Every structure is written in C-alpha cells, then in structure tokens.
Amino acid sequence: MENQFKNNNNSSSIETSNQFSNKKTNRLDSFVSVSELHEEAKRLLPKMAYDYYASGSNDQITLAENENAFSRIKLVPRSLVDVSKVNTKTRIFGRDISTPILIAPWAMQRMASQRGELDTVEASKEFNTIMTLSSLSTTSVEDLSSATNGNPGWFQLYVFKDRKVSEELVKRAESIGYSALVLTVDTPFLGKRTADFKNSFKLPNGLSLKIFEKLMLSNLDGGLNQYIATMIDPSLTWNDLKWLKSITKLPILVKGIMCPKDAELALQYGADGIIVSNHGGRQLDTCPSTIEVLPYISKVVRGRVPLILDGGIRRGTDVLKALAFGANAVCIGRPIIWGLSTGGKDGVLKVLNLLNSELQLAMALTGITNISDINNSIIWDQNKYIKL
C-alpha cells in the first residue's frame, strides 16, 4: 500500500506547507531514516569535524540516554478514528509554522557544508519552521537575514564577561529581524569533551566565527575550551536575565533547564519560554535525559510560556512523545548536521521531511489529527489499566 504520509501536493490526506518531495529524485531519496544520514555524514566528514558534532562529555552516558530514554516510552495505538487528515501545523510566539520540529542552535556549520548556516536557514524558511542561529556561527547574522528577507528566526546568546559584547550582539540581531533570543544558561564552563581534546580541535583554515569578526573576537586558534574560558561569564545569575530583558523587546527563551526549581526561577525572572536541554549530552555527564525531566518541568510551567524539548529526537515518534509529555515543540540539532553534511540545504530538508512525515504517521496511528489534541493519554501507563 502506498504511504499516504508523504508531504506532497498530491496527497489529500495530509495538510502541510512543505513541497520538498516535489523536487527531482536524487541520491537523498535512498535515505529513509536519520540514522542512515548519520552514517553517511560520518563517512563524509573529516574526523575532527565529525567528532566535534557527534561527541558528548566524559563517558557520554547522557549523550546515549537522550536517545535511549525514548525507546522506554511506549505509545498507545487507537482504532477506528477518522485520521484521513492529519495536520502538524502549530504556532509559537504568534508565528504559524508547518511543524513543531524546530532547528536547534549548532555551532560552526560550515565545517559540515560549504554554505553552512545559509543552507540550514534557507531550508528552515522553505519548510516554514524556525532555526536558532548559534553565537558561534561561521556565517554572519547579516548574511542570514538577507537570505531570508529579514526573517532569519531566533538568535542564541551566551552572556560574555564583557556585557557590552553581549549587548551589541542583541541589538545587532534585533535590528536585522531576529524574532527571539535563546539564552544558553548551562555553560558556565565547557564540559570535558575528550574527543575535542584529543583532536586539538580548532576551526579549519579559512573559517572563523563571523558574528565576532567586527569585535575582533573570531579567532579560535587556541581551541574551544580556551575560547569559552576567556569569553563566557561563569558568574552569570538570574539577575542577568532581568538585565537582558531590560535591553531588548524580543522574547527570551532560556535554554539549558533540567531542574524543576530552575524552571520556576526562570519564570519568576521573566523568561518568555523554556527549553529543556542538557546541551546534547555535552556538559554534565550522567545527568538525566531531557525526556525524563520534561514531565516534571511541564508541571511547573503549566502552559504559561512555550516549553520546548531539545535532545535525543531521532524519530517522529520521539517528537510525539515529547509533545504528549507537555512540550509545545522540539528542537533537533545533530540530525540537522547529518543532513547538512550529506546534502546541504536539500539534506536539511530531507531530515525535516523525514521526521515530520513520521510524526504525521505516529499521530494517525494514535488517533490524533491536530497538534493541539496531543496529550499524555497516548503514553502507555500500565497502572492505568492494571485494574481493568
């Protein structure tokens, strides 16, 4: 039977704005999962670049758990529900998007493709989703704004020891069309990333941190650990969130929340959104997976601000589970890098198309037709049925 969950104009069963599958057939058509794209990216990328993108901290226990925890969560199939039309459209900060799958900030994307962040932002625009640009980008904010006609998405920010640097970045991003700030709060120091240490990681010749060129801060020759230690302020507190809100009108999402108490503090100090994230398993090893802590943070947030899960998403069923546990959306990082490495812009679109199609199928098989109808009743809980 032909799969009805392909995102194309010929399918009346699916409402979607994505038309990527109308493009001519190419080698990307042979990839049917994110894991296959991962293997291809591993084959194509130089070892130092691949290790930077793929590795976690210490023994990489949290890195593995981010993915493995999803497999322990079971979904409940439903029958005889009209699922002839499944719609993944949603809204965040007043913007209508085609999918709850957002693109996480990821540094130095021109190690993955020649155009790097330009490929990614153009794919996000075509798919009608949101990309967050990393502060450690190898493409300038101005170039990305131009490529999207002044609507490049969200901007990820570290607070630097020199607050003037952070303030200038905020003003610069706001002036050219970025619609939200993503404040990363889980990196007072860089996690112990063994692979980067062994590789003496630094940017390849010809690449630089473009965002900082005007500030004469783009040189990474001393290595990432030294750069972070020199630039990022480990004395950051919740009062700095208040300061940040005082210098911008943009909504601010706090990224790196893994503790319910921190979620409450984020709300108290004015966060406009919360991203549950452990930095892709690259900071504190042996901390829980993000999907494990999401339900507890959702109980704190109670729908007051957008709640986003980051980490471990590799299948559309993972997206559905995150939404069922209370997330409004998810962010994907490494899958985007694997697509970017394999096929540039079209590779990123391939990843988005794969995951969104899988999400649509999972929604249909659990009897759901709209994102707003997803709740935790689709999560198998033996205790609910043990007395039946």
Swiss-Prot record:
PROSITE patterns documented for this protein: FMN_HYDROXY_ACID_DH_1 (PS00557), FMN_HYDROXY_ACID_DH_2 (PS51349)
Per its UniProt entry, which superkingdom is the organism in?
Eukaryota
Keywords assigned by UniProt, alphabetized: Flavoprotein, FMN, Oxidoreductase
Please name the Gene3D superfamilies in this protein's record: Aldolase class I
Query: Residues that bind FMN, according to the entry?
Result: 105-107, 134, 156-158, 184, 255, 277, 310-314, 333-334
Residues bound to glyoxylate are 52, 158, 193, 279, 282
This enzyme catalyses:
glycolate + O2 = glyoxylate + H2O2; a (2S)-2-hydroxycarboxylate + O2 = a 2-oxocarboxylate + H2O2
| Cofactor(s) needed for function | FMN
Q: What class of enzyme is it?
A: oxidoreductase
* SUPFAM superfamilies xref list: FMN-linked oxidoreductases
Q: Name one GO molecular function term.
A: FMN binding
Q: Which residues form the active site?
A: 279 (proton acceptor)
Q: What is its EC number?
A: 1.1.3.15
**Carries keyword Lipid biosynthesis?**
no
Annotated stretches, region: Disordered: 1-21
Report the residue ranges that make up the FMN hydroxy acid dehydrogenase domain in this protein: 26-384
Report the cofactor remark.
Answer: Binds 1 FMN per subunit.
The keyword Protein biosynthesis is assigned to this record: no
Q: What does this protein do?
A: Catalyzes the oxidation of glycolate to glyoxylate, with a reduction of O2 to H2O2. May use other 2-hydroxyacids as substrates.
Subunit details: Homotetramer.
In terms of PANTHER family, this protein maps to: 2-HYDROXYACID OXIDASE 1 (PTHR10578:SF107), S -2-HYDROXY-ACID OXIDASE-RELATED (PTHR10578)
Record-stated family:
Belongs to the FMN-dependent alpha-hydroxy acid dehydrogenase family.
Q: Can you name this protein?
A: 2-Hydroxyacid oxidase
Organism per entry: Dictyostelium discoideum
